[in-house]
Amino acid sequence: MKQYLELMQKVLDEGTQKNDRTGTGTLSIFGHQMRFNLQEGFPLVTTKRCHLRSIIHELLWFLQGDTNIAYLHENNVTIWDEWADENGDLGPVYGKQWRAWPTPDGRHIDQIATVLSQLKNDPDSRRIIVSAWNVGELDKMALAPCHAFFQFYVADGKLSCQLYQRSCDVFLGLPFNIASYALLVHMMAQQCDLDVGDFVWTGGDTHLYSNHMEQTHLQLSREPRALPKLVIKRKPDSLFDYRFDDFEIEGYDPHPGIKAPVAI
């Protein structure tokens, strides 16, 4: 994950001081891309421990189309707590848009099921895309989508994915985002009888919060370790039937975790 550390250093060296919605303040750059060959290991940051349980459960939650944090709480995941209302609802965030995008005539489009069908039946299509950026519902969402748009690509029997992330918290959020989409590529590839290819991450406003600087310098002082390996222990009948216990990460030997405040 040397690329990730290089991005951190680039933001420190080249970033512009900006104000932001949370009032915290950031160092920010605009436009950055990283490419991870998923054949070479699972891209889970090793210069600090990442909470893999949260990453897996959040993705399973998205894929169920869920937008209430009850499932996350049942599994001791608290990463969405700050944005939920008193009933645990978040409004029409990722899961709703992925699985039930509303149309003007009252129908709902399951973008994930559509993408799966495209990958199986028309893998050369240039329209294998999922968007969470529903302009008509942004004002109903507790938090507008940060990882907003992703596209799949099949070549030589390998499945690749590119994500556009319009806003990126480099220290806290980005390690989660990279691992989450890498996991999704592995799941999609298994369901479509493909090998994994690349995960390409493209960032828009890519920033370090002003209260993450000490933690960033600590992380940059650490040497990356070998990437772990993802093992999927069974192939469910459907993408929507995976369970937490289906996934195992082998050889994950990270440096200790580094705590940092979340900007709300």
UniProtKB/Swiss-Prot annotation:
UniProt key word Transferase: yes
Origin superkingdom: Bacteria
GO biological process: dTMP biosynthetic process; dTTP biosynthetic process; methylation
GO molecular function terms attached to this record: thymidylate synthase activity
Gene3D superfamilies: Thymidylate synthase/dCMP hydroxymethylase domain
CC annotations in GO: cytosol
Pathway: Pyrimidine metabolism; dTTP biosynthesis
Residues binding dUMP: R21, R126, R127, R166, S167, C168, D169, N177, H207, L208, Y209
Any Pfam family matching the protein: Thymidylat_synt
Annotated InterPro entries: Thymidate_synth/dCMP_Mease, Thymidate_synth/dCMP_Mease_dom, Thymidate_synth/dCMP_Mease_sf, Thymidylate_synthase, Thymidylate_synthase_AS
Entry-linked CDD domains: TS_Pyrimidine_HMase (cd00351)
Keywords: Cytoplasm, Methyltransferase, Nucleotide biosynthesis, Transferase
Record: residues binding (6R)-5,10-methylene-5,6,7,8-tetrahydrofolate: H51, D169, A263
Subcellular location, record wording: Cytoplasm
Catalytic activity: dUMP + (6R)-5,10-methylene-5,6,7,8-tetrahydrofolate = 7,8-dihydrofolate + dTMP
Annotated active site: C146 (nucleophile)
Annotated EC: 2.1.1.45
PANTHER family: THYMIDYLATE SYNTHASE, THYMIDYLATE SYNTHASE 1
Role this protein plays: Catalyzes the reductive methylation of 2'-deoxyuridine-5'-monophosphate (dUMP) to 2'-deoxythymidine-5'-monophosphate (dTMP) while utilizing 5,10-methylenetetrahydrofolate (mTHF) as the methyl donor and reductant in the reaction, yielding dihydrofolate (DHF) as a by-product. This enzymatic reaction provides an intracellular de novo source of dTMP, an essential precursor for DNA biosynthesis.
Family membership noted in the UniProt record: Belongs to the thymidylate synthase family. Bacterial-type ThyA subfamily.
Quaternary structure (record): Homodimer.
HAMAP family xref list: Thymidy_synth_bact (MF_00008)
Record protein name field: Thymidylate synthase
Primary gene name: thyA
